[in-house]
């Protein structure tokens, strides 16, 4: 029998605030175990949580970017469970009255556009970590992560393949990094995924028992885990069995999923409103103030670049991968007025230098002002593209350098004086009579050879386009 997978994802997105969600302890990653904790994180009697306003603002910004409804009276709930890395015995989370309600994103899968609906995005605190590799006979507990702010983004079960799930996950990962609300570092646990997977006969609309795949920490593992789970469930149904609702772990070494525990329902967690935290009161003015901070989003920017500048998809993908790159590109285009030239030089030449020096775009030492001035000099033929690379290399090493001064001190200004170029061209044609005869005999590719010889005479300073025109005219005239 043929089956259709039904997949929903729960993405756990750590917010990059300085402090935790309900305490002033540092939320920074990588400190010595149990050094970023205080009385609130340790659940001392009598302490009270205080909401981190920046975390709330980040959640609202994210919801607006998703086209969600912002719940102005969202409620914090206690999710009760016993686990050693949660000192309180409960997690402060949200449920149906979450701050982010609804919304959707578009994804591209195998050349087709699909829509994935958002169920909700809940603002909650992260748990601590159980550490198994320090002690031989015990498990350690590190509470540095306990209380770090998270958004748990719950999708509707709108995905029907591992490829669609990964495309959705990548889309959200890109968005949170673009907005600057999370670093999305999967190795450090800043972006984690739980996948809910079920299957049903093709054509059926009934939702069957789902299996939750827990804490998958890479795009590749998400694809593998979902595909393996789809095959496992298919084998069970083909053998006449039934799939049990449970939580399973993915083992990437054995390429299999294994039972972790039976899957809990909401009632098992005994949710109730946290009595220490009043419902939120987000005014319309507050929401609009945050909306005003929303940048032009990646999809809108990509559409504009495609429509206004006719850029190709690969170049657009490079430009919108971060907000900083897109802002830089827009600033350069505003001054040099040549979008295709700017896009090419940013995505090729500037990217080359960043890669060679193992730097991110945030560490780019060349200002948009310098870069636009460089492109203006290339655009108006003051310098050749080849010498433009030399200027860029110099700017990379000298952050305060002036483009005009670099061109003059390095002697890179192009020679466009017709008389000088005609003299060199005549000398070249006189020096290569055989090649001239061959050209006139039909070997027109030799034109590039003649241009190259003039460029040598000028030490690379001649304007190659002008040289090309002059030599063509000379060859036709004679």
Curated annotation (Swiss-Prot):
Q: What does this protein do?
A: Allows the formation of correctly charged Asn-tRNA(Asn) or Gln-tRNA(Gln) through the transamidation of misacylated Asp-tRNA(Asn) or Glu-tRNA(Gln) in organisms which lack either or both of asparaginyl-tRNA or glutaminyl-tRNA synthetases. The reaction takes place in the presence of glutamine and ATP through an activated phospho-Asp-tRNA(Asn) or phospho-Glu-tRNA(Gln).
Name listed for the protein in its UniProt record: Aspartyl/glutamyl-tRNA(Asn/Gln) amidotransferase subunit B
Reactions catalysed, as given in the entry:
L-glutamyl-tRNA(Gln) + L-glutamine + ATP + H2O = L-glutaminyl-tRNA(Gln) + L-glutamate + ADP + phosphate + H(+); L-aspartyl-tRNA(Asn) + L-glutamine + ATP + H2O = L-asparaginyl-tRNA(Asn) + L-glutamate + ADP + phosphate + 2 H(+)
GO MF annotation list: asparaginyl-tRNA synthase (glutamine-hydrolyzing) activity; ATP binding; glutaminyl-tRNA synthase (glutamine-hydrolyzing) activity
Instruction: Name the Pfam families on file.
Output: GatB_N, GatB_Yqey
For this entry, list what GO says about its biological process: glutaminyl-tRNAGln biosynthesis via transamidation; translation
Listed EC numbers: 6.3.5.-
Family the UniProt entry places it in: Belongs to the GatB/GatE family. GatB subfamily.
- For this UniProt record, give its keywords in alphabetical order, as a comma-separated list: ATP-binding, Ligase, Nucleotide-binding, Protein biosynthesis
Q: How the protein assembles, per its UniProt entry?
A: Heterotrimer of A, B and C subunits.
Please tell me whether the keyword Ligase is annotated for this protein: yes
């Amino acid at each position: 029998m043929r089956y259709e997978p039904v997949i929903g994802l729960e993405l756990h997105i750590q917010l990059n605030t300085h402090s935790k969600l309900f305490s002033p302890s540092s939320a920074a990653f990588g400190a010595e175990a149990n050094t970023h904790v205080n009385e609130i994180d340790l659940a001392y009697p009598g302490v009270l949580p205080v909401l981190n306003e920046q975390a709330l603002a980040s959640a609202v910004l994210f919801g607006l970017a998703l086209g969600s409804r912002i719940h102005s009276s969202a409620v914090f709930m206690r999710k009760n469970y016993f686990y050693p890395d949660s000192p309180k015995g409960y997690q402060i989370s949200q449920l149906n009255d979450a701050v982010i309600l609804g919304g959707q994103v578009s994804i591209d899968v195998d050349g087709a556009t699909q829509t994935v609906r958002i169920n909700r995005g809940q603002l909650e605190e992260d748990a601590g970590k159980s550490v198994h590799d320090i002690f031989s006979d015990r498990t350690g507990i590190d509470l540095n992560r306990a209380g770090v702010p998270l958004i748990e983004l719950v999708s509707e079960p709108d995905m029907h393949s591992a490829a669609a799930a990964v495309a959705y996950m990548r889309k959200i990962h890109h968005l949170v990094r673009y907005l600057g609300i999370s670093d999305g570092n999967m190795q450090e646990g800043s972006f984690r995924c739980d996948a809910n997977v079920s299957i049903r006969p093709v054509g059926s609309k009934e939702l069957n028992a789902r299996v939750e795949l827990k804490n998958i920490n890479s795009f590749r593992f998400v694809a593998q885990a979902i595909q393996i789970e789809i095959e496992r469930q298919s084998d069970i149904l083909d053998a006449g069995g039934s799939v049990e609702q449970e939580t399973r772990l993915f083992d990437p070494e054995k390429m299999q999923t294994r039972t972790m525990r039976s899957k809990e329902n909401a009632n098992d967690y005994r949710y109730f409103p946290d009595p220490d935290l009043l419902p939120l009161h987000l005014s319309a003015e507050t929401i609009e103030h945050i909306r005003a901070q929303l940048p032009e989003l990646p999809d809108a920017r990509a559409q504009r670049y495609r429509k206004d500048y006719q850029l190709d998809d690969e170049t657009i993908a490079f430009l919108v991968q971060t907000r900083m790159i897109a802002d830089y590109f827009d600033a350069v285009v505003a001054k040099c007025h040549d979008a295709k030239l700017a896009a090419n030089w940013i995505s090729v030449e500037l990217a080359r230098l960043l890669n060679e020096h193992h730097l991110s775009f945030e560490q780019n030492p060349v200002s948009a002002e310098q870069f636009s001035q460089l492109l203006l000099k290339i655009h108006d033929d003051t310098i050749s593209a080849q010498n433009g690379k030399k200027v860029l290399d110099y700017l990379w090493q000298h952050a305060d350098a002036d483009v005009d001064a670099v061109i003059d001190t390095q002697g890179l200004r192009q020679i466009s004086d017709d008389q000088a170029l005609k003299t060199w061209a005549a000398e070249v044609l006189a020096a290569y009579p055989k090649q001239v005869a061959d050209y006139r005999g039909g070997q027109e590719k030799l034109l590039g050879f003649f241009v190259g010889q003039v460029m040598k005479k000028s030490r690379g300073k001649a304007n190659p386009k002008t040289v090309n025109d002059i030599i063509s005219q000379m060859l036709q005239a004679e």
